[in-house]
Each structure stands twice: as structure tokens, then as C-alpha cells.
């Protein structure tokens, strides 16, 4: 399994750019602020003098891509493409794990659920300025979630939770998760009189 996929068009683009560089120059792919919400990926030239001992080298047709050891796990499943659109051509870099490191299939349930929330659910809620934090997973199999940002106190929270988030999580973790609860509802349920 290749760690990073570079399309044929993007490879041709890199080869063309590298022709005008000093011999032995390759490319470097990196992540700035990896594992944070403001992670950003980039590509730069990598002359031979810039290759570090702990870099990983991925060989492509006519050039290599070097990745530093900190960026490496965050670039898993990344894809680089060179797309031609009406306004011209553009290099696109998609790195689904840049903001959060990919979690192993056999990792504890709470880590796997948190990964899905951070990489799939929160990006959807971000357009409303909202986000979800996983607080815990109860012994009886419920994910306890805290809604924050624009979601906090929003009357649509219940709908979002039940129809969107809970449904998605239960489908993905079939047999492991029974459902999801909002922490406010969870707290109210444990020590309230009404």
C-alpha cells in the first residue's frame, strides 16, 4: 500500500518543475502543525543538501518524495493531483489524516470513535461553527458527546445528534456502539428529579 498517492498528471508536473532545478533535487511533502485543527500540507523542492537522516523516501517515476518523520504518519492516505479546470491548472493535496493521526483498527473503541468524530463529523459541523467532543463511552455502549461552538444551546442539537451523528456512529461501529447521548442530557438523567 503506497503511503501517498501522486497521480500521473501530478508526477509529470513535478518532473517538469524539477528539470529547471539543480541536479539531484527532489520534492518534499510536509505538514505544518500536524495533528491540530489548523494543520496544513505543503510541497517544496528538496535539494540533496536538505535530505535528513530520518526522512522517508518514496520513489516515483523520475523523482523521489521525501517526508520528515513527524509529518509521515499524518500523510497516510494523502493524495496529490494536478487538475485542469476552466481557470487553469492547479495542484491539489488531500490529506485526510493531517489534522489527526490515523487510528489502528484494533485501537480502543474510544480512540476509533474520536477519530471518526474529528475527521468526518466535525468537518461537517464546522460550516455551522459547531463541533463535538467525545467525553466518554459508557459501559452500556453509548458515546457521550459534548456539543460546542455554534451547536451549544442550538435547538437543532437533538435532531443533529439523533438523525446525523448517532446514526453515522452506530452504522460505523455496528455491534460496539448502541447510540450517542448529549452530555447535558446524560448529566440531567443521572441526578435530576424531572
From Swiss-Prot:
InterPro entries: Fe/S_biogenesis_protein_NfuA, FeS_biogenesis, FSCA_dom_sf, HesB-like_dom_sf, NIF_FeS_clus_asmbl_NifU_C
Cofactor binding: number and manner: Binds 1 [4Fe-4S] cluster per subunit. The cluster is presumably bound at the interface of two monomers.
Cofactor(s) in the UniProt record: [4Fe-4S] cluster
UniProt GO BP: iron-sulfur cluster assembly; protein maturation
Protein's job: Involved in iron-sulfur cluster biogenesis. Binds a 4Fe-4S cluster, can transfer this cluster to apoproteins, and thereby intervenes in the maturation of Fe/S proteins. Could also act as a scaffold/chaperone for damaged Fe/S proteins.
A Gene Ontology molecular function term of the record: iron ion binding
Organism: Actinobacillus succinogenes (strain ATCC 55618 / DSM 22257 / CCUG 43843 / 130Z)
The protein, known as: Fe/S biogenesis protein NfuA
Keyword tags: 4Fe-4S, Iron, Iron-sulfur, Metal-binding
